[in-house]
Amino acid sequence: MSVDLSSATEGDLRELAARGAASLEGASARELLQWTEETFGSGASEGTGYRNSFIVASNMQDGVLVHLAAQVHPGVDVLFLDTGYHFAETIGTRDAVEQVYGVNVINARAEASVAEQDAAEGKDLFAREPNRCCALRKVAPLKKTLAGYKAWVTGIRRVEAPTRANAPLISFDDAFGLVKINPIAAWSDEDMQSYIDEHSILVNPLVDEGYPSIGCAPCTSKPAPGSDPRSGRWAGQAKTECGLHAS
């Protein structure tokens, strides 16, 4: 199916996602990213006025997904949600990933600074209303940034949490209105470590300190040994996702 991305409708994107999902079930991460490049990248942009119509999202826990994507699209756009609450180690990893892998990091930020949010909402909104804090500092900036693209690539994996156990490889993202590709959804922790070792991938130093899932500093703690890797996120609260991923 050939689609002029500059005028693609939601229906066109839904059909692209459905066709991709049907033809690429069981495909490797490389094959999924190659399809993404051919469908939404520079290989699909001739005559459409569109370039870089997909973006890769990374929380900078490691550089695996960015490294994979840069192999098929050098200089690819990489989305980082700069919430204002990140660990210094995460910011350092972001800067290193951009330099080492030669990608274009786009820092998506909330309309208000942390200080402005404190003044408007009260100090430490994350502790009182974590869902609202995520909506303001993650979901809204993400939605605004994704509006400029036709597809986004994420690093969610099925083994990370029960809420992600059925994550598809390719789907239409109803929440943000574009195609969503999860090329490493089927990867195990062993697959990740093998790729990191084989390619000397950059890893956030906090991983070696016992943080298997890294988010904003105030809302991230070390999970108990053997527990859900994401159980250290918003520990003690009835919250397991920040609102970015329905699956």
Swiss-Prot record:
Pathway: Sulfur metabolism; hydrogen sulfide biosynthesis; sulfite from sulfate
An individual GO BP term: cysteine biosynthetic process
Region feature (Disordered): 222-247
Active-site feature positions: C242 (nucleophile)
Coiled coil: none
Class of this enzyme: oxidoreductase
GO MF terms held by the record: 4 iron, 4 sulfur cluster binding; adenylyl-sulfate reductase (thioredoxin) activity; metal ion binding; phosphoadenylyl-sulfate reductase (thioredoxin) activity
EC number: 1.8.4.10
SUPFAM superfamilies for the chain: Adenine nucleotide alpha hydrolases-like
Subcellular location: Cytoplasm
Pfam families recorded: PAPS_reduct
Keywords: Cytoplasm, Iron, Iron-sulfur, Metal-binding, Oxidoreductase
Cross-referenced CDD domains: PAPS_reductase
Catalytically driven reaction(s): [thioredoxin]-disulfide + sulfite + AMP + 2 H(+) = adenosine 5'-phosphosulfate + [thioredoxin]-dithiol
Entry note: cofactor: Binds 1 [4Fe-4S] cluster per subunit.
Assigned GO CC terms: cytoplasm
Binding site for [4Fe-4S] cluster: C133, C134, C216, C219
InterPro entries xref list: APS_reductase (IPR011798), PAPS/APS_Rdtase (IPR004511), PAPS_reduct_dom (IPR002500), Rossmann-like_a/b/a_fold (IPR014729)
The protein's required cofactors: [4Fe-4S] cluster
Protein family (similarity comment): Belongs to the PAPS reductase family. CysH subfamily.
UniProt-recorded name of the protein: Adenosine 5'-phosphosulfate reductase
Underlying gene: cysH
